[in-house]
């Protein structure tokens, strides 16, 4: 009789423990509905996962039933940073420079970087383009010589701005002037030959370039040539994470699903069509090439187009640390390291562990343009 009682107690404990696990796993789904506003850049490959989440409504799987998510598109990250600081957006998809800058607004609104959306060898945002009638350079180093004394343009405060500053410092190139121009103005000025060069990011590079685009500019070099990687991040307001850790984690579960979707070659055509549907002027062929196409070797192409670490690996940490130091040295920010608690992938690591997913999640090996499905 006593043995039966002990068995009953054990079974009761096991059942209680199992129910507890189910309850913990289902915390977000059992919570009250939420209204989220997400800032993303459909004109940037670091936000393609957000575009997938938006199009396929993946967030419905993890957020409480009845929740609503509003996606607000922006042409560059600084716009998203301003919206997050003003508490108009809780979540933002950012390139490396605006991501780092966002964390320095501690007196107004502390912002955390909570996950990585992509890490490339300078293939995404660190791209130097030259006007269409520039010489056909045999190597990026040859292009560097031509670029000295030329007129550059880039959107100030962007990840491309960071690379241009780094490029000038590393090569000693002295631009005639550096113009602060939007993506559209740069494209227009390339058409009428008002600028010699620009530093831009994908998919605008593919849109105006000679490989699948309009042909008003040519890729001359990338960050791969100068050992300067680029990355994308998910930023969240610190007060949002503190008040709603379950919702923040639920969003990262959704992000994991989206990144895994992008990594599957069977989905590449659909990803391109999704991006086309959330942009203007970007064709499916341009969207496909911007993340899955191979940049030629002679202008800085790398063996890997993009890596999806998701968490902050040593390589991601190195990029973050270097970005703080560099932006402080050129007086863009007033600190040379991350504020306490600003770089926090705790929830991302939990999500990866619970999904039993590898880190990195995967790598995109680019295909030649001739293999495009479009």
Locate predicted features.
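Bacterial N-terminal signal peptides that target proteins for export
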Residues: 2-14
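Short, glycine-/small- and polar/acidic-enriched structural segments
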Residues: 29-182, 189, 196-202, 218-222, ...
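Secondary-structure end/capping motifs
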Residues: 243-335
């Amino acid at each position: 009789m006593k043995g039966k009682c002990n068995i009953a107690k054990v079974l009761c404990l096991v059942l209680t423990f199992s129910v507890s696990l189910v309850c913990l796993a289902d915390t977000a789904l059992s919570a009250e509905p939420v209204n989220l506003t997400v800032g993303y850049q459909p004109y940037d490959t670091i936000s393609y996962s957000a575009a997938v989440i938006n199009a396929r409504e993946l967030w419905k799987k993890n957020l409480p039933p009845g929740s609503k998510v509003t996606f607000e598109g922006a042409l560059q990250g600084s716009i998203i940073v301003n919206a997050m600081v003003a508490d108009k957006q809780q979540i933002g998809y950012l390139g490396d420079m605006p991501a780092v800058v966002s964390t320095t607004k501690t007196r107004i609104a502390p912002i955390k970087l909570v996950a990585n959306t992509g890490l490339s060898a300078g293939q995404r945002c660190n791209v130097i383009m030259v006007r269409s009638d520039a010489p056909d350079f045999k190597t990026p180093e040859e292009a560097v010589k031509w670029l000295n004394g030329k007129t550059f343009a880039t959107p100030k405060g962007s990840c491309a701005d960071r690379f241009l500053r780094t490029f000038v410092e590393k090569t000693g190139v002295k631009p005639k002037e550096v113009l602060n121009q939007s993506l559209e103005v740069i494209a227009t000025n390339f058409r009428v030959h008002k600028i010699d060069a620009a530093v831009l990011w994908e998919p605008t590079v593919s849109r105006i370039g000679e490989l699948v685009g309009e042909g008003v500019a040519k890729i001359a070099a990338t960050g791969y040539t100068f050992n300067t990687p680029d990355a994308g991040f998910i930023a969240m307001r610190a007060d949002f994470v503190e008040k709603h850790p379950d919702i923040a984690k639920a969003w990262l579960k959704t992000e994991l699903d989206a990144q895994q979707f992008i990594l599957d070659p069977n989905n590449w055509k659909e990803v391109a069509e999704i991006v086309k549907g959330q942009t203007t002027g970007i064709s499916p062929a341009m969207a496909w090439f911007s993340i899955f196409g191979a940049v030629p070797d002679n202008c800085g192409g790398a063996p890997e187009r993009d890596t999806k670490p998701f968490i902050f690996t040593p390589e991601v940490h190195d990029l973050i640390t270097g970005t703080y130091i560099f932006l402080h040295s050129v007086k863009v920010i007033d600190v040379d390291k991350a504020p306490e608690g600003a770089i926090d992938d705790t929830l991302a690591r939990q999500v990866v562990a619970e999904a039993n997913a590898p880190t990195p999640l995967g790598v995109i090996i680019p295909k030649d343009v001739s293999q495009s499905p479009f």
